[in-house]
Amino acid sequence: MVLIRVLANLLILQLSYAQKSSELVIGGDECNINEHPFLVLVYYDDYQCGGTLINEEWVLTAAHCNGENMEIYLGMHSKKVPNKDRRRRVPKEKFFCDSSKTYTKWNKDIMLIRLDRPVRKSAHIAPLSLPSSPPSVGSVCRVMGWGTITSPQVTLPDVPRCANINLLDYEVCRAAYPELPATSRTLCAGILEGGKDSCGGDSGGPLICNGQFQGIVSWGGDPCAQPHEPGLYTNVFDHLDWIKGFIAGNTDVTCPP
């Protein structure tokens, strides 16, 4: 069984201005409060995703995180303890690979969000640069988010978790998930022996390999973190022209085939 890494109706998030559901990474440790100034929480209806701030006005996340009543929280660490840098934004515009907003588990699971207002850099808000080179199999990658830390049961920590996983050959994921096509614009990442993985609620968050933003959490095995069932991540590098085109105002730009 496979899992789109979104969870719903899990926990009421205690905020001074909203109440939403919440979740975290399997097998990880608590992220350092200073290591994720680019990490955002994306809430819509009763669902949660992650996302990545790529400049003061734009967030990159997964297409399957699209929904109504979307709210985006930046500068957050603890869900229970507010800090002075925390900011709330809503989408001004949302862009997908095509106008029908279609995607599959192995293609076009990417969404670019323009915020209603830019955010200023601070101690806990800063963008993550887009990658300057393609990802390399064997790289050590960092995944992070507020997703469930147990699976299939749900356990919800207060702060984001971070875990190191490996970028694997795409054929490893094809062996685990026979429905995958021969080629895909997704990355395969995880730990072959299991125990560490992104999971429900982490969708849309970043996969950072050798310090570069290479992937977007998309989907994987259910339960999460099982041996020989890595996660799938949208390949950011393959979509650079599309991302940069929209940010520059070129709405005619198209996603790679």
Curated annotation (Swiss-Prot):
Residues 1-18 form the signal peptide. Expressed by the venom gland. InterPro entries: Peptidase_S1_PA, Peptidase_S1_PA_chymotrypsin, Peptidase_S1A, Trypsin_dom, TRYPSIN_HIS, TRYPSIN_SER. GO terms for biological process: proteolysis. It comes from Protobothrops mucrosquamatus. Keywords: Disulfide bond, Fibrinogenolytic toxin, Hemostasis impairing toxin, Hydrolase, Protease, Secreted, Serine protease, Signal, Toxin, Zymogen. This is Beta-fibrinogenase mucrofibrase-4. Belongs to the peptidase S1 family. Snake venom subfamily. One of its GO terms (cellular component) is extracellular region. Residues 25-248 form the Peptidase S1 domain. Monomer. Its EC number is 3.4.21.-. Snake venom serine protease with fibrinogenolytic activities. Cleaves beta-chain of fibrinogen (FGB) efficiently and shows relatively lower activity on alpha-chain. Negative results: does not have activity on gamma-chains of fibrinogen (FGG). Disulfide bonds join 31-162, 49-65, 97-255, 141-209, 173-188, 199-224. PROSITE patterns: TRYPSIN_DOM, TRYPSIN_HIS, TRYPSIN_SER. Its main location: secreted. GO terms for molecular function: serine-type endopeptidase activity; toxin activity. It comes from the Eukaryota. The active site is at 64 (charge relay system), 109 (charge relay system), 203 (charge relay system). Residues 19-24 form a propeptide. It is found in: Secreted.
